[in-house]
Structure formats: structure tokens, C-alpha cells
Regions:
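N-terminal leader segment of winged-helix/HTH proteins
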Residues: 1-27
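Canonical helix-turn-helix DNA-binding module
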Residues: 46-88
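N-terminal helix-turn-helix DNA-binding core of bacterial DNA-binding proteins
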Residues: 19-58
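Amphipathic alpha-helical dimerization/coiled-coil segments
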Residues: 18-21, 101-122
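Basic, amphipathic "hinge/linker" alpha-helix immediately C-terminal to the N-terminal HTH DNA-binding motif
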Residues: 82-103
């Protein structure tokens, strides 16, 4: 199987995407905040602080701080579990969906602007 993208190309693309996102997107999220946001949108629910902490191998307080920021930006929403008040579910929002769509579009655009990257599967 031929290499689709080299490690150098991957780092170059990452650098371009991060730089473009700082210029063009409305939010400057940390890696942890981005990981939580992507987990909520890319993995099947339910999403709780507890399972997010376990799957990302990050402390519950750190996940709570990330969710605090994401909630204030309306990228995710907290919802109390009616059956177990200790649990808090994390839910998607329209604003979060739009942000991630724009972020994905930015990644695709930057990848297309790198002539040496083969975007087709090998």
C-alpha cells in the first residue's frame, strides 16, 4: 500500500489548519476543548463527564473546565440526567455543528492547497 501522506506533509497540513483557524474561525479552542467537542459530535451518545474523562484519559475536573468554555460558547449543552442527578449529559448544539462544519471545510481547503498531498485512498 502506498503512502497517502508523509509525516512531514501531515505536520505541514496541521500547521496550516491551525494558523487558518486562528485567522478565520470565531473560536480559539484548546486541544482539550477540541477533543471534547469532537467526541460529542463524532461518537454515539450518551456523553457524560465521567465517560469523556475515561475515554480521553483526562481528569473529570479538566473535562468540566473544557465543558464550561464550550457551554459558554454554545458549542455543547449540559443536560441533567433525570434518573441520576449526579450525571450530566453533554449534547450537541446548532452552533457547535456549524463550527465543526466550518472547521472541516477549512481542513479540506488547506489539504487541497497542498499540491503534494494525495487525497485519494491508496
Amino acid at each position: 500500500m502506498s503512502e497517502i501522506i508523509t509525516t512531514q506533509d501531515a505536520l505541514n497540513l496541521w500547521q496550516r489548519v491551525v494558523s487558518s483557524s486562528l485567522r478565520e474561525l470565531p473560536y480559539d479552542l484548546s486541544q482539550r476543548q477540541t477533543a471534547v467537542l469532537l467526541a460529542v459530535y463524532m461518537t454515539p451518545p450518551p456523553h457524560t463527564i465521567r465517560n469523556m474523562s475515561s475515554s480521553l484519559n483526562v481528569s473529570k475536573p479538566a473535562i468540566c473546565r473544557a465543558v464550561d468554555v464550550l457551554s459558554k460558547l454554545d458549542l455543547v449543552r449540559r443536560k441533567k440526567d433525570e434518573e441520576d442527578r449526579r450525571n450530566v449529559f453533554l449534547q450537541r448544539t446548532i452552533n457547535g455543528s456549524v463550527f465543526l462544519r466550518d472547521f472541516a471545510d477549512l481542513i479540506v481547503r488547506e489539504a487541497k492547497n497542498m499540491p503534494d498531498i494525495n487525497l485519494k485512498a491508496a
